[in-house]
Amino acid sequence: NGEKMKFHGVSIHHDNGALGAEENYKATYRKLKLLKDMGVNSIRTTHNPASPQLLDAAASLGLLVQEEAFDTWYGGKKEYDYGRFFEEEATHPEAKAGDFWSDYDLRTMIERGKNNPAIFMWSLGNEVSEANGDAHSLKTIKRLLERVKEVDDSRFVTMGMDQFRFGDGSGGHEKIADLLDVVGLNYSEDNIDGIRKRHPKWRLYGSETSSATRTRDSYFRPDKEWVGDNRRVRNFEQSDYGNDRVPWGKTATASWTADRNRL
């Protein structure tokens, strides 16, 4: 709407606590309302298309949504995950001739959501290791981008990429990122200055950052940060002070500091 707005976002999965993966509009609305009251203004659906209930609740609450299509491409992350079908011929009666399942599933996600005012970006994947800039991955990203723009050319297309956190962040994956409208950085705050220097025209945002986790009512000294060698000492619990993190992430404070210093 012509107004600059900073993302205060969260990545959320499709479960609702004790309800598990069973969708319930009231539970989803409650979850999003709590997040909004906390200061959240945007959501990334990790790492799959959202339920209609979540999209409706987000629109009702005025929250922005980045809808994510895939957690893997053809490489797969688990033996029986979506990677088995990514480049398999789609057999759905509404699939187009020559469609892979990834074509059909991506197209139907966008056709469903293109008129929802909450959606502001489409994501083509999360931490896709095979998106490394080789010929196969470049052909794939161009195909997926074409599928998106055929249906909706009004929204930006992005990915959540973790390859930028290794070394100085450079590599073949930059060829993939260069084709995106917006580049999502997963756990790559330490390299953001170098990325900006190499690619001054890229639009960047933190698609996945802190991964700060807590065990309710379990407290450990604030000066002690969770690391791999003290898990058993803590009975595999994490501090409710907010000073713990997953091995690949940062505490919330560390992520906010990196963001604050670049305002």
Residue ranges and their predicted role:
Residues 3-182, 186-193, 198-203, 208-215:
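Active-site mouth of glycoside hydrolases
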Residues 184-189, 193-263:
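Active-site core of glycosidic bond-cleaving carbohydrate-active enzymes
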